[in-house]
């Protein structure tokens, strides 16, 4: 299914019929230019479970300011340039359309904001998700430093919620003599 969210934040509940979060879904956290393998593995598990798939992108350039009692989430940008998050979501949608076109699974996209682990956790609670799928981080010194300061999304999800998590390797396994900090 093509994007039923029309760019709307899946956390918002302003219009419960058009923005309802699919129940018992498989959730996959996706970033732009991520290998297609993460999406195809998530689709495979959604098909096995007979569950819908939510392709979630977290805009880390925005943060949650507050949530209305009705569930509508208000956000504010960290940077005044909003176009970065919108462009990333468009790239995620294009990748999802290409990867999931013939997958035989109902899917939708969700734009989340803030900390990736907390945003995915919140969405998983709303959907009563069966599984959360994420990819490993990219190799390279820059990604190692980023992970040192922000932590692994997969590890943080494993410690902060109780749903099963599938971590999909992005690259071929490293050999024993490979440099883990080398850019790929």
Protein language model regions, located:
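Structural beta-alpha unit
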Residues: 1-22, 34, 48, 98-132, ...
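General small-molecule cofactor/ligand-binding pocket signal
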Residues: 54-56, 108-112, 166-168
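A short acidic, glycine-rich active-site loop
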Residues: 74-91, 142
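Glycine-rich, Arg-bearing micro-motifs that act as flexible, cationic patches
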Residues: 131-159, 175-178
